[in-house]
């Protein structure tokens, strides 16, 4: 029986890794071993940061809402508490968008939150 070598399989595997490593710096996009090491690391970063992104955006929304609340003479925590007591169910993404793009609507929400706290 003839000996089977890995020529085609190896070439395909190397091409796949090097294709995914496009844009990496220096040897990390040219040499298979370095590319493979960096690619494994990159996939770990990607996995981690897909989860981190959700936390980062929530923090950003809270900062924006807090800034708009302060302009309306109410703290963030009292604002959220007031909205809950007034049965206004808007998530932080929508509230942050209102705070940035529609100050009048946000001021009306802040007024409702203040009234609910009284």
Curated annotation (Swiss-Prot):
Q: Which UniProt keywords apply?
A: Ribonucleoprotein, Ribosomal protein, RNA-binding, rRNA-binding
Record bears the keyword rRNA-binding = yes
Entries under InterPro entries matching the protein: Ribosomal_bL20, RIBOSOMAL_L20_CS, Ribosomal_protein_bL20_C
GO cellular component terms, alphabetically, are: ribonucleoprotein complex; ribosome
A Gene Ontology biological process in which this protein takes part is:
translation
Q: Which GO terms describe its molecular function?
A: rRNA binding; structural constituent of ribosome
The UniProt similarity line reads:
Belongs to the bacterial ribosomal protein bL20 family.
Q: What does this protein do?
A: Binds directly to 23S ribosomal RNA and is necessary for the in vitro assembly process of the 50S ribosomal subunit. It is not involved in the protein synthesizing functions of that subunit.
Q: By what name is this protein known? A: Large ribosomal subunit protein bL20
Give the organism, scientific name. Campylobacter concisus (strain 13826)
